[in-house]
């Protein structure tokens, strides 16, 4: 990735993190809230690959953790994995497919919700499973899917297309 591309991507992640904390997280619709930063990180992972996706996920999650004064590292870890998963999906299946952002955002929203719940539970925080995994996750999934394609198009326009990566066809284990 070039330096100007990395700077543009960093600005997009920072703006998305600020919007997430200041505006978007306060808009609760049907019990769930849109996760704009997750959609942006997934889009960057699809466009740039697994390593940049993980880096931008960590950076965006760290900004959110610092601004909300939540348990430091939970959002960072969840978004790091989300960016990595999206990048691997883009590298292995072809990021040019029209439905790739929808599939990635849908699957990663569910995985991030479950993983976030498990992290909070393992840290001993009071989390109600029904609320975290049903009441909040289902509307969040619907909202994320609703805005996945427009946000992905906006991110692609802002940061440009990533380098052409040929899909991985096989993996060799070296001993």
What are these model-derived regions, one by one?
Residues 1-175:
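Terminal, non-globular segments
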């Amino acid at each position: 990735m070039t330096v100007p591309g990395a700077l543009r991507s960093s600005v997009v992640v920072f703006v998305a993190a600020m919007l997430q904390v200041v505006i978007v997280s306060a808009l609760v619709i049907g019990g769930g809230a849109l996760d704009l930063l997750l959609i942006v990180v997934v889009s960057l992972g699809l466009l740039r690959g697994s390593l940049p996706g993980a880096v931008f996920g960590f950076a965006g999650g760290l900004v959110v953790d610092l601004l909300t004064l939540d348990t430091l590292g939970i959002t960072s870890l969840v978004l790091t994995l989300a960016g990595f998963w999206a990048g691997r999906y883009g590298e292995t299946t072809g990021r040019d497919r029209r439905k790739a952002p929808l599939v990635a955002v849908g699957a990663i929203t569910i995985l991030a919700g479950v993983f976030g719940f498990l992290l909070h539970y393992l840290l001993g925080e009071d989390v109600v499973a029904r609320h975290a995994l049903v009441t909040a996750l289902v509307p969040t999934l619907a909202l994320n899917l609703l805005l996945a394609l427009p946000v992905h198009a906006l991110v692609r326009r802002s940061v440009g297309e990533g380098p052409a990566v040929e899909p991985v066809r096989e993996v060799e284990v070296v001993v």
